[in-house]
């Protein structure tokens, strides 16, 4: 895994560092403290780290194999979203992340009822942002291992995801890597099927087109060549007349 940046500006994957023919961009959104960063790090590194610094919106990258194809995955972590008297409160970074992404992971914690209640508004934000096209969205319920402090019933997640027409996964970032990997990997597979595949020789074709003017072409005869050829022809005629 590679941390591309931790600034609020979202940059494209540097082309020089990305030999893959496909780049998948995923934004992870949700309320504060639901475990977004833990999910991202768990998926990309298999590790779980319990303590994190305040989420500043890091952009992570990793190359993986999907159906035999090398794919570059960019995962944009985002600051937590809250609800205030005026509705959904999120930073410009969250909005830009959604607009930038090819797919979105919405996360809530089963221990936080408020994080579950704002999912509907988050889904509306995503669909409004991508009103011109439909992008893959999945709903992830995190912290499934904390049964003793559960505040969202197990049946509520699937019901909500069905209403929003998106896939649902209940996971524990701290205890089960396979659950987390399954959710993200399935999303990447579905997204890869939707994206047109770039031909392997596409880059080389462009390069060849750019280099084509460098191919040597026959030179037009200059004045020195013309004079030299004229003298050769003239000398040949003189020799012919002399021999006669």
Swiss-Prot record:
GO MF annotation list: G protein activity; GTP binding
Matches recorded under SUPFAM superfamilies: P-loop containing nucleoside triphosphate hydrolases (SSF52540)
Keyword flag RNA-binding: no
A Pfam family this chain is assigned to: Ras
Disordered: annotated span: 200-222
InterPro entries listed in its UniProt record: P-loop_NTPase (IPR027417), Ras-related_GTPase (IPR051065), Small_GTP-bd (IPR005225), Small_GTPase (IPR001806)
Organism domain of life: Eukaryota
Gene3D superfamilies cross-referenced by the UniProt entry: P-loop containing nucleotide triphosphate hydrolases
Entry protein name: Ras-like protein family member 11B
């Amino acid at each position: 895994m590679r941390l591309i940046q931790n600034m609020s500006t979202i940059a494209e994957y540097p082309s020089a560092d990305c030999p893959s023919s496909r780049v998948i961009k995923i934004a992870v959104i949700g309320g504060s403290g639901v475990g977004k960063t833990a999910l991202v790090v768990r998926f990309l590194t298999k590790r779980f780290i319990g303590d994190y610094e305040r989420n500043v919106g890091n952009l992570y990258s990793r190359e993986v194999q999907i159906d035999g194809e090398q794919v570059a995955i960019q995962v944009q972590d985002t600051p937590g979203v809250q609800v205030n008297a005026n509705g959904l409160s999120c930073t410009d970074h969250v909005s830009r992340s959604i607009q930038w992404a090819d797919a979105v992971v919405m996360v809530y914690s089963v221990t936080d009822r408020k994080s579950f209640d704002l999912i509907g508004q988050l889904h509306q934000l995503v669909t409004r942002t991508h009103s011109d096209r439909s992008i893959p969205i999945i709903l992830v319920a995190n912290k499934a291992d904390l049964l003793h402090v559960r505040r969202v019933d197990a049946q509520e997640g699937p019901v909500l995801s069905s209403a929003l027409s998106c896939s649902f996964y209940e996971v524990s970032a701290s205890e089960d890597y396979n659950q987390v990997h399954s959710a993200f990997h399935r999303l990447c597979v579905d997204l890869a099927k939707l994206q047109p595949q770039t031909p392997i020789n596409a880059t080389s074709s462009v390069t060849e087109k750019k280099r084509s003017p460098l191919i040597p072409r026959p030179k037009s005869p200059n004045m020195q060549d013309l004079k030299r050829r004229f003298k050769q022809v003239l000398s040949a005629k003189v020799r012919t007349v002399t021999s006669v």
